[in-house]
Amino acid sequence: VVGGDCIPQVPFLAFLYSEYFC
C-alpha cells in the first residue's frame, strides 16, 4: 500500500511500509 498508509497489505513488510510510506 502506497500513499502514506501505515497499515500495509503485507504484515511482513509492515515495518518497511511504515518507514517509507508514513
From Swiss-Prot:
Keyword Secreted recorded: yes
* Domain of life where this protein originates: Eukaryota
What tissues harbor this protein? Answer: Expressed by the venom gland.
GO BP: proteolysis
Q: What's its EC? A: 3.4.21.-
Entry PTM: Glycosylated; required for activity. Highly glycosylated with 42% of N-linked carbohydrates composed of Fuc(1):GalN(4):GlcN(5):Gal(1):Man(2) and a high content of sialic acid residues (8-12%).
Question: Activity versus temperature?
Answer: Optimum temperature is 50 degrees Celsius.
List residues of the Peptidase S1 domain: 1-22
According to the record, the protein's activity is controlled as follows: Inhibited by aprotinin and dithiothreitol.
Q: Tell me where it mainly resides.
A: secreted
The entry's keywords: Blood coagulation cascade activating toxin, Disulfide bond, Glycoprotein, Hemostasis impairing toxin, Hydrolase, Protease, Secreted, Serine protease, Sialic acid, Toxin
Q: Subunit structure of this entry?
A: Monomer.
Family affiliation = Belongs to the peptidase S1 family. Snake venom subfamily.
Q: What name does the UniProt record give this protein?
A: Thrombin-like enzyme BJ-48
Q: Upper taxonomic classification of the species?
A: Eukaryota, Metazoa, Chordata, Craniata, Vertebrata
